[in-house]
């Protein structure tokens, strides 16, 4: 039961950090390549 409580307290923190970094990455991509419907990498 203690492991379940540890998991339930760690999962929101990790998901917040993951989605925050993903949002920051998308914001930076949109800042460098504005209005890109297809990524001009290839």
UniProtKB/Swiss-Prot annotation:
GO terms for cellular component: chloroplast thylakoid membrane; photosystem I. Gene3D superfamilies: Single helix bin. The chain crosses the membrane at residues 7-27. One of its GO terms (biological process) is photosynthesis. It is found in: Plastid, Chloroplast thylakoid membrane. May help in the organization of the PsaE and PsaF subunits. Belongs to the PsaJ family. This is Photosystem I reaction center subunit IX. It comes from Lepidium virginicum (Virginia pepperweed).
């Amino acid at each position: 039961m203690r492991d379940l409580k540890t998991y339930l307290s760690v999962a929101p923190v990790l998901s917040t950090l993951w989605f925050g970094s993903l949002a920051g990455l998308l914001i930076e991509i949109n800042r460098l390549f504005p209005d890109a419907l297809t990524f001009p990498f290839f």
